[in-house]
């Protein structure tokens, strides 16, 4: 499984060569084995919690074929709100800053059938070309744990490269998706600001020009395109979205 792209994994699920539960167990097994040395994922949920989400997803009336990420486990950069999980920004005083609702991108991922398992590590406030902070510590490179995974989406990059998750969101102002992707032998994409909507009322980016934008990291360009098709598009909370 660990060598497969997101699109290949989705194909295996559709062909029933692997079940959603088996996929989840596979990734949690790798997380248990490799995340202690990588420190790529933080604020992790338990597998039992995520399995309950999967059962609820299977019980809903919407057909699987309409859910483009059905049963895919994902983690979200620790600058982005996931209801019930802390958004720490890598800052110790925010370790108990539990989000009361999802960000727009998280709602779109969940609506597509994704299972949110936790957060990906980031430098404090997402500022830096290397991923380390006082809240959780440094993220290591899966190819050599004595080396950096880059930043600021270093937790996302290390998680994909180590096959802890198949794809991830990121954010990018001056290379924060592209830098860690290069460090971890992946593809990172910084889209035009507004392609992936954000709640601008929560950010300082209320006026043009907007420098920082949400983006994505993946094993293949095809995976990037697939992910962007899901999370992009206009939203009433973002006047610059399209």
Question: What spans do the regions from the language model cover?
Answer:
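An N-terminal boundary/leader segment
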Residues: 1-52
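Enzymes and membrane/adaptor proteins characterized by extended Gly/Ser/Thr/Asp/Glu-rich
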Residues: 34, 68-105
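Short pre-catalytic strand/loop immediately N-terminal to key active-site residues, enriched for Gly-Thr
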Residues: 92-100, 137-152, 212
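Gly/Ser-rich catalytic serine loop of serine hydrolases
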Residues: 98, 145-157, 171-176, 180-181, ...
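Nucleotide-cofactor and metal-assisted catalytic machinery
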Residues: 109
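Paired acidic/hydrophobic, glycine-rich loop segments that form the ligand-binding mouth/hinge
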Residues: 117, 166-170
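Alpha-helix C-terminal capping segments
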Residues: 157-167
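A short helix-breaking turn/cap at a secondary-structure junction
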Residues: 190-242
């Amino acid at each position: 499984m660990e060598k497969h792209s997101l699109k290949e994994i989705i194909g295996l699920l559709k062909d029933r060569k692997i079940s959603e539960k088996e996929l989840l167990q596979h990734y949690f097994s790798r997380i248990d084995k490799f995340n202690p040395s990588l420190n790529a994922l933080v604020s992790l949920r338990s597998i039992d919690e995520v399995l309950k989400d999967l059962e609820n997803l299977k019980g809903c009336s919407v057909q699987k074929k309409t859910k483009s990420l059905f049963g895919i486990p994902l983690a979200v950069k620790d600058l982005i709100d996931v209801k019930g999980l802390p958004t720490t920004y890598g800052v110790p005083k925010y370790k108990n800053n539990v989000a009361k609702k999802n960000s727009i991108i998280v709602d779109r991922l969940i609506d597509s059938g994704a299972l949110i398992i936790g957060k990906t590590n980031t430098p404090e406030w997402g500022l830096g070309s290397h991923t380390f902070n006082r809240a959780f510590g440094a993220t290591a490179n899966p190819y050599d744990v004595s080396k950096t995974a880059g930043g600021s989406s270093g937790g996302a990059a290390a998680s994909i490269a180590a096959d802890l998750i198949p794809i991830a969101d990121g954010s990018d102002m001056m290379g924060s998706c592209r830098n860690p992707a290069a460090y971890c032998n992946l593809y990172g994409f910084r889209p035009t600001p507004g392609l992936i909507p954000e709640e601008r009322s929560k950010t300082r980016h209320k006026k043009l020009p907007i420098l920082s934008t949400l983006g994505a990291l993946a094993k293949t360009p095809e995976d990037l395109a697939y992910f962007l098709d899901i999370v992009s598009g206009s939203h009433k909370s973002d006047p610059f979205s399209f």
